[in-house]
A protein has these predicted regions:
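Membrane-embedded alpha-helical bundles that constitute the cytochrome b-like, heme-associated redox core
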Residues: 2-165
Length: 165
């Protein structure tokens, strides 16, 4: 459905649609990471068995993050801010808001997605349940910290955007 919406819109509408979905999926990524971290912590503390539900949370957290990555990359390619940055690097580097979206946000979010991907893959391959929980908890928590720093919150000194766009 997402791709159909993009194909049926012109460039300006596509950019606005991508911005909306990227903003919406931010909350799904955050919620799924918090849930996965909670399940990792609770499973580790309680010495619980790594259940099918835990595995689904691990899997869907990574999947949601990857969907967000695809939306973000498409948005990056369409963004007038990014186009301005690459066409006017020397001037654009002096503007923190532009530099944030062109470089800082991109690098930090890519790093976070890599951490989620590695953490998910390692947790899947661990044999001991305690190690599955520990791996998921550690890698996903690191990714969450990076994501929280890289989101352009309304109160961020780097760049700010509203909670919903």
């Amino acid at each position: 459905m997402f791709l159909i919406l993009l194909l049926c819109t012109d460039r300006k509408d596509m950019y606005q649609t991508l911005t909306f979905y990227h903003s919406f999926f931010r909350w799904l990524v955050l919620a799924s990471l918090v849930l996965a971290i909670y399940r990792g912590y609770a499973g580790l503390i309680k010495n619980a068995a790594f259940s099918r539900s835990d595995n689904l949370v691990r899997h869907w957290t990574a999947t949601i993050a990857h969907i967000q990555l695809m939306i973000g990359i498409t948005l990056y390619a369409q963004s007038p801010v990014i186009k301005y940055f690459w066409n006017n690097k020397s001037t654009a580097l002096k503007n923190l808001d532009t530099t944030f979206f062109a470089l800082i946000h991109l690098i930090l979010m890519l790093t976070a997605i890599v951490l989620i991907t590695i953490g998910s893959a390692l947790a899947k391959r661990r044999t001991a349940d305690k190690e599955k929980f520990r791996t998921m908890l550690t890698w996903f928590a690191l990714a969450l910290l990076i994501i929280l720093a890289a989101i352009p919150w309304p109160f961020s000194p780097l760049a700010n955007r509203p909670y919903w766009r």
